[in-house]
């Protein structure tokens, strides 16, 4: 396994729409293992392949503290949404930035697992939010782009200031 580099917003590659995985093979399974290692090392709960500059429809997540429920979604599609909720989100591609995003309260998602087997998952709460957040990445959308123009401007200014201080 290897740690992967996580792209940082506003890197344009984060806006690339991911292509479907054609075949779940050893290359995809290695990508999944590397994504889990990267996500855990970065203390995240979800990671989309787009964030590591691989533009295929692969997502990993684990909402547990003890890493006991790793989930893999290959070619995920949300087939149903219901309700509305807000949640303060963060993102490994936008470190240190958190803001409230409105999303569906419940979702039903269809995907393939790491063996290439199709499954359906009905999710609510944090899992539903995480699914929607990560699937946004596959569509080239970063969570801050779900915020008002004013908030987006403030975040970009904050990130530019931070970047100047690290150079």
From Swiss-Prot:
It comes from the Bacteria. GO terms for biological process: co-translational protein modification; translation. Its cofactor is Fe(2+). SUPFAM superfamilies: Peptide deformylase. Keywords: Hydrolase, Iron, Metal-binding, Protein biosynthesis. InterPro entries: Peptide_deformylase, Peptide_deformylase_sf. Binds 1 Fe(2+) ion. The active site is at residue 134. Its EC number is 3.5.1.88. Fe cation binds at residues 91, 133, 137. It is an enzyme of class 3 (hydrolase). It catalyses: N-terminal N-formyl-L-methionyl-[peptide] + H2O = N-terminal L-methionyl-[peptide] + formate. CDD domains: Pep_deformylase. GO terms for molecular function: metal ion binding; peptide deformylase activity. Belongs to the polypeptide deformylase family. NCBIfam families: pept_deformyl, PRK00150.1-3. This is Peptide deformylase. It comes from Neisseria meningitidis serogroup B (strain ATCC BAA-335 / MC58).
């Amino acid at each position: 396994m290897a740690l992967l580099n996580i792209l940082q917003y506003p890197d344009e590659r984060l806006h690339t729409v991911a292509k479907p995985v054609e075949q779940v093979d050893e290359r995809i399974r290695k990508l999944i293992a590397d994504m889990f290692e990267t996500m855990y090392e970065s203390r995240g709960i979800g990671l989309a392949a787009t964030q590591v500059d691989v533009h295929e429809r692969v997502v990993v997540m684990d909402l547990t503290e003890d890493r006991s429920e790793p989930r893999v979604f290959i070619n995920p599609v949300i087939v149903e949404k219901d309700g509305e909720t807000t949640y303060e989100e963060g993102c490994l591609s936008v470190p240190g930035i958190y803001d409230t995003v409105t999303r569906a309260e419940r979702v039903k998602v269809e995907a393939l697992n790491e063996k290439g087997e199709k499954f359906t998952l009905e999710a609510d709460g944090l899992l539903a939010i995480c699914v929607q957040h990560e699937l946004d990445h596959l569509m080239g959308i970063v969570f801050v782009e779900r915020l008002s123009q004013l908030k987006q401007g403030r975040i970009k200014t904050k990130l530019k200031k931070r970047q100047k201080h690290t150079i």
